[in-house]
């Protein structure tokens, strides 16, 4: 397990706002910091050499244990078509690729695939897969029940697909807020810390795949004929 520590230095003057309010404020800030740290580790973590989990966007060399960035498995355009056959075809290739593990053994992945994209790209994906129903409602859905999720740790222009149950994320125990009033005495401040143990790694290099996003909203140039 890896130890994850978060801390905050609070000026003692803030205690005038009340000790209960300060503790609640510090706890909220540090827990949010935890969430950001875990999100980074589970997506982009560089492994034990970096004292981090192995992220979903990484490959692990089975012989040396070296952790490297995943190479792109293809391109996704989410281009419009009369009946959505382009999107269905592109995502079919994703589902097909994830249906085989690193040892070449087939596995069931339907209803288990999650697509993670940066919030900037999420708007483009949503726009390309949203339709208006006969009742006037706007509905967004992806083929094969792929679940879209936003994450700031995924680079812009990339889409991360992973299979539920193929990534081992472990968090041990709870956390406890500790207060140290002597550490920063000269600065007239109090140090607050929380710590927790966590780790994560994919079961194999086919637990997740990375694709390039090339979503364009520029209409194709018209071809003039004489």
PLM-predicted stretches and their roles:
Residues 17-19, 124-126, 171, 201-203:
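Short helix/loop capping segments that flank catalytic or ligand/cofactor-binding pockets
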Residues 55-185, 190, 196, 222-226:
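Extended oligomerization regions of viral-like shell subunits
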Residues 201, 206-226:
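Structural signal for terminal/edge beta-strands and the immediately following C-terminal loop/tail
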């Amino acid at each position: 397990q890896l130890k994850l520590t978060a801390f905050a230095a609070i000026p003692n003057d803030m205690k005038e706002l009340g000790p209960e309010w300060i503790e609640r404020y510090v706890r909220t800030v540090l827990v949010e910091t935890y969430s950001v740290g875990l999100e980074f580790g589970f997506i982009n973590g560089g492994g034990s050499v970096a004292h981090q989990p192995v992220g979903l966007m990484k490959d692990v060399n089975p012989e040396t244990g070296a952790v490297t960035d995943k190479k792109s498995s293809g391109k996704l355009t989410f281009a419009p078509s009369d009946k959505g056959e382009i999107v269905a075809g592109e995502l079919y290739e994703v589902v097909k690729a994830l249906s085989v593990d690193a040892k070449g053994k087939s596995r069931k992945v339907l209803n288990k695939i999650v697509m993670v994209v940066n919030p900037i790209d999420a708007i483009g994906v949503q726009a390309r897969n949203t339709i208006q129903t006969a009742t006037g409602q706007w509905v967004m859905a992806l083929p094969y029940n792929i679940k879209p999720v936003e994450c700031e740790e995924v680079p812009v222009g990339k889409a991360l697909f992973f299979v539920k149950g193929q990534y081992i994320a472990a968090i041990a125990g709870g956390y406890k807020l500790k207060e140290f009033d002597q550490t920063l005495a000269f600065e007239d401040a109090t140090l607050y810390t929380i710590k927790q143990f966590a780790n994560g790694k994919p079961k194999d290099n086919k637990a997740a795949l990375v694709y390039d996003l090339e979503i364009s909203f520029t209409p194709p140039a018209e071809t003039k004929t004489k």
